[in-house]
From Swiss-Prot:
Biological function: Required for rescue of stalled ribosomes mediated by trans-translation. Binds to transfer-messenger RNA (tmRNA), required for stable association of tmRNA with ribosomes. tmRNA and SmpB together mimic tRNA shape, replacing the anticodon stem-loop with SmpB. tmRNA is encoded by the ssrA gene; the 2 termini fold to resemble tRNA(Ala) and it encodes a 'tag peptide', a short internal open reading frame. During trans-translation Ala-aminoacylated tmRNA acts like a tRNA, entering the A-site of stalled ribosomes, displacing the stalled mRNA.
Location of this chain's protein in the cell: Cytoplasm
Gene3D superfamilies in the record: 2.40.280.10
Chain coiled-coil ranges: none
One of the protein's GO biological processes: trans-translation
Lineage: Bacteria, Pseudomonadati, Pseudomonadota, Gammaproteobacteria, Lysobacterales
Organism the protein comes from: Stenotrophomonas maltophilia (strain K279a)
Pfam (any one): SmpB
Name of the encoding gene: smpB
Keywords: Cytoplasm, RNA-binding
HAMAP family: SmpB
Protein name (Swiss-Prot/TrEMBL): SsrA-binding protein
InterPro entries per record: SmpB (IPR023620), SsrA-bd_prot (IPR000037), SsrA-bd_prot_CS (IPR020081)
One GO MF term: RNA binding
Amino acid sequence: MSKNSGKDKAKSATANKTIALNKRARHEYHIEERFEAGLALQGWEVKSIRAGRGNIIDAYAYVKHGEIFLIGAQITPLIQASTHVVANDRRERKLLLHRSEIDKLVGKVERDGYTIVPTAMYWSKNKIKLEVALAKGKQTHDKRDAAKDRDWAIEKQRVMRRGNRDA
């Protein structure tokens, strides 16, 4: 065992923790609550994700027979992946959640008109986790207001920086 193996492991674990982010979800939805879910993956999918070939931008989750599935997430297979398994890069993937979390999500989706969107995919204790959010869709004027607020915050920062230089 090398002298710095513990430090190297800690640095590499924190540096490569996030696999994929869904920035579009923050723009398109009002995010109410977040949940951590496991993913039921095949071996080639884990290998592809390790190589950085996971994408959750167009993904969403839906309820089917009391279970929650992720659809639209793209995991591109590696060229040297196994040939005896047919690799479908956009297949349905089951989300692994506690029953109480599933019941809460199902109730909100069916009664209150919420949707379930993935916001991040990351490593946690050598397992791939998906952060899903309970969200409501934004209307066009909400998106414009958010953009206006963001632009104003940037402009305020510029003015403050200029003011600090003059003083």
